[in-house]
Amino acid sequence: MVTLAIDMMGGDDAPGIVLEAVEKALNDFPDLHIILFGDEKQCNIKHSRLEFRHCTEEIEMTDEPVRAIKRKKDSSMVRAAQAVKDGEASGCVSAGNTGALMSAGLFIVGRIKGVARPALVVTLPTVSGKGFTFLDVGANADAKPEHLLQYAQLGNIYAEKIRGIGAPKVALLNIGTEPKKGNSLTKEAYQLMSEDTSFHFSGNVEAKTLMDDAADVVVTDGFTGNMVLKNLEGTAKSIGKMFKSTLLSSVKNKLAALILKKDLNEVMKKMDYAEYGGSVLLGLDGNVVKAHGGSNARAFYSAIRQAKMAGEEHIVEIMRETVGEHNG
């Protein structure tokens, strides 16, 4: 049985989509137990494996992260993180304030001993539909070469255990594929990664080939990663708008759209973040999953499934025994 702590109040469309996702997850996974934190007046579901805990506070998207975590002790997010810290749950899931959740992860759940800086990891789509693990996408704007090495170690474990990829190809995001390309950060990180035998380092990869299955795990600093992530999201939305505009521009195009509807939907499904769940803060002494703030019920359900799998595969324990002990 895996127990997860869920923040019912976080997200643009909470608590509605959270409750819908929780109910589906409980019905789909007989080995899942959920502790739900939020306003009891807004909870309209009951289940034998659902435990509800009323909270009197809520962290808003506009709240200053660290201040909110310290002052709103009875918020649904803080109490969900505390449940992980106390060992009541193997992980927590929230679609709330990203900065606040990262702060809760750092200050409440805590880092694995030996991990210098946790990294925010996401799974992004590729042309083949396989996807790739990308980190750091915003936990730390600045990074040192040794931090990127740890990200590679953490990302390798995540790709193996959560995504089921044997011997993942781990690459470093750079401005060229040659070993000597890049700035001092990437050059030094390249050297460290090429000397590490705990994962398969495939070298540098350029941003233009990210979606062409260039690697299973791609590592970068949080500043670069966040910009790449937002650029990919924005580009996907813009292409979708261009497709729609073109297909609705004439009767001929509308007929073509009807014929191609199934194929177009398949392409859009490959590009949909909801298929891949949320982002995970790796390197913490517990599983912390951040669902997209604009998540629908399907996306939040995917985030729950992701957190459940992390608990089942004991990735925190593995990271503690490998990355943590190696650097402790």
UniProtKB/Swiss-Prot annotation:
Homodimer. Probably interacts with PlsY. GO terms for cellular component: cytoplasm. Its EC number is 2.3.1.274. Catalyzes the reversible formation of acyl-phosphate (acyl-PO(4)) from acyl-[acyl-carrier-protein] (acyl-ACP). This enzyme utilizes acyl-ACP as fatty acyl donor, but not acyl-CoA. GO terms for biological process: fatty acid biosynthetic process; phospholipid biosynthetic process. It comes from Staphylococcus carnosus (strain TM300). The keyword Cytoplasm applies. This is Phosphate acyltransferase. Pathway: Lipid metabolism; phospholipid metabolism. It catalyses: a fatty acyl-[ACP] + phosphate = an acyl phosphate + holo-[ACP]. Keywords: Cytoplasm, Lipid biosynthesis, Lipid metabolism, Phospholipid biosynthesis, Phospholipid metabolism, Transferase. HAMAP family: PlsX. GO terms for molecular function: phosphate:acyl-[acyl carrier protein] acyltransferase activity. Belongs to the PlsX family. PANTHER family: FATTY ACID/PHOSPHOLIPID SYNTHESIS PROTEIN PLSX, PHOSPHATE ACYLTRANSFERASE. It is found in: Cytoplasm. Transmembrane segments: none annotated. InterPro entries: FA_synthesis, Phospholipid_synth_PlsX-like.
